[in-house]
Amino acid sequence: YLGATVQVIPHITDEIKRRIKGISNDIDIQITEIGGTVGDIEILPFLEAARQIRKELGQENVMFVHVTLVPYIGPSTEMKTKPTQHSVSVLRSSGISPDVIVLRSDRELNDEIKSKVSSFCDVSFEDVISAPDLGDIYEVPLKMHEEGLDKSVDTRLNLSTNEPDLEKWKNMLHLKAGVEKTVEIAILGKYFGLPDSYLSVVESLNHASLHNQVKLNLHWEDSDNFNVEDLNKFDGVVIPGGFGYRGIEGK
């Protein structure tokens, strides 16, 4: 920086924008997730960079989808929208107004809740999306289509797309639900402290089991403390790669 004082704005925000814009020039749509919680100090530079990107690329080329939690209060049997209202208010104070609000909850949200969020957060009713917990993560695309999220994106970005053909996806879920045979697979690893350490391996096994019409039953075996003979009870063993001494020894 040639001796200049390095500041959050513009230096850090400019670098964030450079990385977001520099992913590829050969794409039609780019999805950029900004994690964390609105209001946290760590997220402020990213929100400012996102605000600037919309200004630079044009309102018609950028949309903001805000995901919030709608908790269920058991004793009063109520779904509380106040956290969502507060979150949107804080987000707006950063200069960003969400185009779509996705409401995460442990159950389906009725039109009354969605209408309330629409009214208090100044978002069209059609752009308030219910995203309840589902039995299978692969049901989510169908649920988002049912809620009209794809139509909201099409409208906001002026896209001209046809109705998606989801029959193969539906058939895949139908086949998955009808599987009866089970296979026992062990993952022999070291990094079990963080659940997502072997996420790609687990998802690959899920895809393989679905393709072979079997139900996957996973077992986690610590490579630092296991008996080789115990592996005989499994139909298969997966040994993921690792790093350094602990990534090799014991495997």
Q: Can you say where each PLM-predicted feature lies in the sequence?
A:
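N-terminal beta1-alpha1 cap of cysteine-dependent amidohydrolase-like domains
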Residues: 1-28, 32-251
